[in-house]
């Protein structure tokens, strides 16, 4: 009886989720931190197309800042609750153009002297569709530069996990956006 009920609930809910994903090819993350804030839009025209990630982040120190999709859309303990980089294939950390990388590894964004980073990234691993969708996960901008998995010496071990990008300056849950 329980399994029958579970099956009925599942059959009622999941088609609605799939339908919502098919209706919108856009997602949005509103980033919030103590000083840093921003809005990031992700657009993907079809499952086979690359995702386009665009937006603006304010309040950063001038220079490069690690920019990643993290595993969880959880902010109960600030950005720490977002967990590690989104890595469904169990790879080591890398840059956005590396052959080996986490799905969530988007490299760095660069803030100008005004503390603003204009984001425009096209990525072939980020997806709004299927089992590895980034919807419901977190977008995180870090306080420091991502070394793209190229750290050496005493920095090599952490580089393979996080890119040594430092503290999480701001984060936001990636949510379905209204269709345009």
UniProtKB/Swiss-Prot annotation:
Q: Which UniProt keywords apply?
A: Antioxidant, Copper, Cytoplasm, Disulfide bond, Metal-binding, Oxidoreductase, Signal, Zinc
The record's subcellular locations are:
Cytoplasm
- Catalysed reaction equations from the record: 2 superoxide + 2 H(+) = H2O2 + O2
Residues binding Cu cation are 68, 70, 85, 142
User: Which residues are recorded as binding Zn(2+)?
Assistant: 85, 93, 102, 105
Q: Which GO terms describe its cellular component?
A: cytosol; mitochondrion
Record-annotated disulphide pairs:
79-171
The signal sequence is: 1-19
- Keyword Lipid metabolism attributed: no
Provide a Gene Ontology MF annotation, just one. Answer: copper ion binding
What are the GO BP annotations of this UniProt entry?
regulation of brood size; regulation of vulval development; removal of superoxide radicals; superoxide metabolic process
Q: Which cofactors are named for this entry? A: Cu cation; Zn(2+)
Known EC number(s)? 1.15.1.1
Q: How is the cofactor bound?
A: Binds 1 copper ion per subunit.
Supply the enzyme class, top level: oxidoreductase
Major location (coarse): cytoplasm
Cite the record's note on assembly: Homodimer.
Family membership, please give it: Belongs to the Cu-Zn superoxide dismutase family.
Q: What does this protein do?
A: Destroys radicals which are normally produced within the cells and which are toxic to biological systems. Required for normal brood size. May be involved in regulating mpk-1 phosphorylation downstream of phosphatase ptp-2 during oocyte maturation.
- What's the protein called, per UniProt? Superoxide dismutase [Cu-Zn]
What organism is listed for this UniProt entry? Caenorhabditis briggsae
């Amino acid at each position: 009886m329980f399994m029958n009920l579970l099956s009925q609930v599942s059959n009622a809910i999941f088609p609605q989720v799939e339908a919502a994903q098919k209706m919108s090819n856009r997602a949005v993350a509103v980033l919030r931190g103590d000083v840093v804030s921003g809005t990031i839009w992700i657009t993907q025209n079809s499952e086979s197309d690359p995702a386009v990630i665009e937006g603006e982040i304010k309040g950063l120190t001038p220079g490069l800042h690690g920019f990643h999709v993290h595993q969880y859309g959880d902010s109960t303990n600030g950005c720490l609750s977002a967990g590690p980089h989104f890595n469904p294939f169990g790879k080591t950390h890398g840059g956005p153009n590396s052959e080996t990388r986490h799905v969530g590894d988007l490299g760095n964004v660069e803030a100008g002297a005004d503390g603003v980073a204009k984001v425009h990234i096209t990525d072939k691993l980020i997806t709004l569709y299927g089992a590895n969708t980034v919807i419901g996960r977190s977008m995180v901008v870090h306080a420091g530069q991502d070394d793209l998995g190229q750290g050496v010496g005493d920095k090599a071990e952490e580089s393979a996990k996080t890119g040594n990008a430092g503290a999480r300056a701001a984060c936001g849950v990636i949510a379905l956006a209204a269709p345009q």
